[in-house]
């Protein structure tokens, strides 16, 4: 199996994101290896030796996705027996030409702490934890969004991801079997209808998830899951609540779709 390296003098997050996004376009499996904080020439030479050894072992050149602000480190890694992709140089040169402004290299700039956005995210994470699964309904006035759905439909991980990644205060509320016996929304949610966003899920997937939690129970039965999913989707439609199916989407995709559909403000930068 061919190896793909993601290397940087910072966190290597940018290299990973660009690299994985690019490789995902090809139906080929890779052995992925991430190496962050390559900040000295000595360390760069060590990594070069590792890359060369990997090429010899695999019988083919590794793919190297890297981001360095230090040109000397770029030169060292680029001289390895590998196919190299330098994202920063590729794009910064074009942008420099367009803006007529020279870039100012700074290590860790991309994923360093920006005080304002950091505070937003910490506050949002604390809010999501305190308002998980219907807790602290009295705080819903502070919410940017309130996710609703049947149990185990993806509300909690999505709430936390929205908070941690984007600084969005996301509460979540479970729609129970009792709630579904009426045609209306739970009374506590009515004042915040404009903040509601629903999640649904395929019954078969829901049953599998619930079975890991409470095996052989009514709660995890496919019949119960089908009833709950059908009823909650009818609830969404009756009350004109936007919703999406989380079955085949990652938490990143779900969150991005929610932000796109609701025009929520990202507080990432």
From Swiss-Prot:
Enzyme Commission number: 2.7.11.33, 2.7.4.28
Binding site for ADP: 149-156
Gene Ontology molecular function, alphabetical: ADP binding; ATP binding; phosphotransferase activity, phosphate group as acceptor; protein serine/threonine kinase activity
InterPro entries noted in UniProt: Kinase-pyrophosphorylase, PSRP
Keyword flag Transferase: yes
Catalytic activity: [pyruvate, water dikinase] + ADP = [pyruvate, water dikinase]-phosphate + AMP + H(+); [pyruvate, water dikinase]-phosphate + phosphate + H(+) = [pyruvate, water dikinase] + diphosphate
EC class name: transferase
Keyword Plastid: no
Annotated Pfam families: Kinase-PPPase
UniProt entry keywords in alphabetical sequence: Kinase, Nucleotide-binding, Serine/threonine-protein kinase, Transferase
Domain of life: Bacteria
Role: Bifunctional serine/threonine kinase and phosphorylase involved in the regulation of the phosphoenolpyruvate synthase (PEPS) by catalyzing its phosphorylation/dephosphorylation.
Annotated family: Belongs to the pyruvate, phosphate/water dikinase regulatory protein family. PSRP subfamily.
NCBIfam families noted in UniProt: PRK05339.1 (NF003742)
PANTHER family: PYRUVATE, PHOSPHATE DIKINASE REGULATORY PROTEIN 1, CHLOROPLASTIC
Protein name, as recorded: Putative phosphoenolpyruvate synthase regulatory protein
Organism, as annotated: Pseudoalteromonas translucida (strain TAC 125)
């Amino acid at each position: 199996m061919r190896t793909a390296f993601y290397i940087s003098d910072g966190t290597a997050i940018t290299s990973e994101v660009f690299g994985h996004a690019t490789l995902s376009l090809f139906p080929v499996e890779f052995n992925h290896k991430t190496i962050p904080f390559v900040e000295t020439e000595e360390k760069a030479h060590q990594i070069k030796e590792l890359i060369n050894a990997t090429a010899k072992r695999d019988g083919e050149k590794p793919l190297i996705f890297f981001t360095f602000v230090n040109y000397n480190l770029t030169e060292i890694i680029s001289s390895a027996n590998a196919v190299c992709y330098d994202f920063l140089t590729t794009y910064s040169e074009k942008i420099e030409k367009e803006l007529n402004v020279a870039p100012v290299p700074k290590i860790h700039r991309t994923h360093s702490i920006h005080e304002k956005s950091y505070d937003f995210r910490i506050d949002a994470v604390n809010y999501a934890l305190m308002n998980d699964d219907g807790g602290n309904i009295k705080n819903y006035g502070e919410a940017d969004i309130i996710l609703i759905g049947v149990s185990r439909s993806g509300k909690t991980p999505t709430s936390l991801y929205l908070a941690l990644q984007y600084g969005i205060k996301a509460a979540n509320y479970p729609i129970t079997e009792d709630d579904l016996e009426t045609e209306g929304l739970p009374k506590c949610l009515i004042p915040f209808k404009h903040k509601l966003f629903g999640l649904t899920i395929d019954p078969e997937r829901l049953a599998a998830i619930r079975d890991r939690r409470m095996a052989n129970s009514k709660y995890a039965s496919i019949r119960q899951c089908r009833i709950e999913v059908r009823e909650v989707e009818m609830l969404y439609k009756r009350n004109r609540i936007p919703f999406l199916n989380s079955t085949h989407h990652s938490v990143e995709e779900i969150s991005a779709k929610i932000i796109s559909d609701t025009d929520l403000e990202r507080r990432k930068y």
